[in-house]
Amino acid sequence: NIVLGFDNFDAYVGNSPKYGASIGPVAGRIAGASFDLDGQTYHLEANNGTNCNHSGSTGWDSALFSVESVTDQEITLYTERADGTGGFPGNLKIWVTYSLTEAGELEISYRVETDQDTLVNPTNHSYFNLSGNFTQPINDHVFQINHQGLYPIHPDGVPLHTVDRESPIVQHLYQAMLLEDLFKDSDPQIRLVEGLDHPFALPEGHENAGFFYHQPSGRFLTFKSEAPALVVYSANFVDETVHLQGKPMVQHNGLALEFQTVPDAIHSDQAEKVILRAGQVFTSKTSYHAIAKK
């Protein structure tokens, strides 16, 4: 298994690292735990300092989805979300589909409908550790991303609204970088969070957003998405109450690849990308492909 997870269902309740979780309606931080939409101010749960992160304690990751359909190749899960939940407007209908393609890819697709103008910016929060040993950090993995720049973050984790295309760490990640070297790097953004917790801008219509490689096992993961950004989180925060494979969680034990629009977009010139109007339908698809190199 190369995706971090628990051995039993109960462990997923109150799952603070959000292993494998579907995050929504809005992934990432919303500055000030509030936003304005159509002339009205909406106040959200401040669960990350003064900010709202991953839609607060009532986000989709706390919901139990029902199985709407299942075949040999895919499963579609469904849930509904009442107007005002977590402070967000709109009655939502939410479908998440997990599919296996003929090419051997895993696809995750989202479909969301609303009866009021609202915010929608979901993601999947799975962590990858290609060694399969979740008690060890991913220092011996190589990571590469075909990005158009990194969004630096403030000390509270909210991204700036400009991208950095020039710093050495940004250039290294475009070429490919051993994560042990990244975790030791003196770049102020890396030191701020002891790793990565940063959005990267992705080229529109890309065929390959990057790769994750574990040379000792030969396991090689590629990924792509219709989303315009990828938040990369390297499990910097340690919750010692979380146990995996019989041992307490260690820092940097996995890499979360969170495809979405850049967090806090509602407070930027990308606001329209996260506003879903009444009667409209939001869709997004992300694909992962794992192989073993000889």
Predicted regions located by residue number:
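An exposed, glycine/acidic-rich loop-and-rim segment of catalytic or binding clefts
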Residues: 1-294
